[in-house]
């Protein structure tokens, strides 16, 4: 497996393959990174970073469009997630962070049952939030987990779990867990709204009485 050198962009967010992500670039070193990527038709990698530092597993990012350029050099742009990579070595020579990365090896496991469960839950979540399920989710059955994660707002830590899993089956199991939890939260929120509309009281069943 060959490694290649690319720019690294630590960020408090997680990009997954196929996801479109808007970025606002304001630091000089990352303005330089964007210029280099544009001039060299190169991609860079977004690595999730928090107080513990940047993770070694991330996702490559292709610049789709620079939507705005400001006079002071700041940029608004949109990137698309490419492939999951692992940083094997940090390198020097640029004003921004660079490293040698290699694609992460996938384990081949049958995930048909998990895919069906994840798709059904995704459709339920979309409908519960008043949205239309995106049919594109089923276009790449081998990466359905990423397609769903790109369309549902999950916490960064949970999206990082997806990047760190080595099989589509394992990722879909995470997706099923997250979507099921999300449906529970939506149901609780709906119940709270209903209670608020009735001053905290739940309507009695038919034929029942009421408090004096």
Task: Report each predicted region and the residues it spans.
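N-terminal low-complexity, acidic/polar interaction/targeting segments
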Residues: 1-212
